[in-house]
A protein has these predicted regions:
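Nucleotide-state-sensitive switch-loop elements of NTP-binding domains
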Residues: 2-145
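C-terminal accessory "lid"/substrate-recognition subdomains
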Residues: 2-4, 149, 165-337, 341, ...
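A secondary-structure boundary/capping signal
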Residues: 15, 42, 133, 160-161, ...
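Phosphate/Mg2+-binding loops and adjacent switch elements
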Residues: 89-198, 207, 212-214
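Flexible loop/N-cap segments at domain edges
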Residues: 348
Length: 367
């Protein structure tokens, strides 16, 4: 595993979503609103994004500078070349947004920011945001592998066009999304009017922030789809605030064994689901690293995302890891406190994952 840090790096947000969900509206807001920030927006083609000549300050081969100081450029293949060109522009940027129309899986774009040394040295992948059409997403999920994978990979979900459906339908849609991806917060929006602060600057790939922002990331609020509990759950079932940061974990009396919980669909999930695992016994550091490396080498193409907080025997700090397909990184972060319930938890989101196999492998890493 490798350590991540991002002092002085430009944060990058990857924007994905099915055709017609509202990505273009969101991008046009970024390019035209007087928000006081200088963003660079990278799109596959300018076709859908309305680049009005009256808004353009100046243009070169494939870069347009807008009146509000933002920049829009197109990429027709070589994302790394476009990023390198942006890095050379005077003034710098507050953030870069990469739109991924036409890609079923945002993974290849996300991986760029981990594997290319020049890009990695100057940018930091901040988050992956999926824009979802509340009115049509259930239909899309039933007939489109792409729509499922976009939700599965996301850190933030903008549930757009909420004014076109009832509250009951919205709850059903949100429950469906949580079955595919139990990790990503859902932001309701109309005409893509989500605050930019909700999707930019989220530090979703910063290991130091994983425990700070979502220490309870395996446990959505009680009563919500995706909450991990069973007959062993050691506290009453009631709603917690989404930003609650104290331990409310299940499994206070689980004993020394692993529990797995998958979030299955009642419609059609094309084999994509989230599987949560917990282990109430310290793990062996070498064993957990070897298991994760082997697992990702064998199944990395099917594992879209993974995150975990691990209690390693003999260590006072928690081991935090994340994975994007076959790329794994981790580091020891923040010491355990007397108030913490020390146990290991991780979640995998991917295709055709075998919960029993994952649970057995995780359990075998116990010290």
């Amino acid at each position: 595993m490798t350590q991540t840090s991002a002092p002085g790096k430009i944060p990058v947000t990857v924007l994905t979503g099915y055709l017609g969900a509202g990505k273009t509206t969101l991008l046009n807001r970024i390019l035209t609103e007087e928000h006081g920030k200088r963003y660079a927006v990278i799109v596959n083609e300018f076709g859908e994004v309305g680049i009005d000549n009256d808004l353009v300050v100046g243009a070169d081969e494939e870069v347009f500078e807008m009146n509000n100081g933002c920049v829009c450029c197109t990429v027709r293949g070589d994302l790394i070349r476009v990023l390198s060109g942006l890095m050379k522009r005077k003034g710098g940027f507050d953030a870069i947004i990469v739109e991924t129309t036409g890609l079923a899986d945002p993974g290849p774009v996300a991986q760029t920011f981990f594997v290319d040394e020049d890009v990695k040295a100057r940018t930091q992948l901040d988050s992956v945001t999926a824009v979802v059409d509340a009115k049509h997403i259930l239909l899309r999920l039933s007939d489109s592998r792409e729509a499922v994978e976009q939700i599965a990979f996301a850190d933030q979900i903008v549930l757009n066009k909420t004014d076109l459906v009832s509250e009951d339908d919205l709850r059903h849609v949100e429950a469906r999304i949580k079955r595919i991806n139990p990790l990503a917060p859902i932001h309701r929006a109309q005409r893509s009017n989500v605050p930019l602060s909700a999707i930019l600057g989220k530090h979703s790939f910063d290991l130091e922030r994983i425990t700070e922002l979502e220490p309870d990331f395996l446990n959505p609020a009680h009563g919500e789809d995706g909450h991990v509990h069973d007959e062993h759950c050691g506290h009453d079932h009631h709603h917690h605030d989404h930003d609650h940061v104290h331990d409310e974990h299940c499994g206070h009396d689980h004993g020394h064994h692993a529990h797995g919980h998958d979030h299955k669909s009642d419609i059609h999930d094309d084999g994509v689901k989230g599987i949560s695992l917990t282990l109430d016994k310290p793990v062996d550091g070498q064993k957990i690293t070897a298991w994760l490396n082997d697992l990702l080498a064998r199944r990395g193409t099917d594992i879209l995302r993974a995150k975990g907080i691990i209690d390693v025997k003999g260590e006072n700090k928690r081991l935090v890891f994340q994975a994007v397909h076959m790329i794994l990184e981790g580091d020891f972060q923040r010491e355990w406190t007397d108030k913490d319930k020390r146990y290991s938890r991780m979640v995998f989101i991917g295709r055709d994952l075998d919960e029993a196999e994952l649970r057995a492998g995780f359990e075998a890493t116990a010290a």
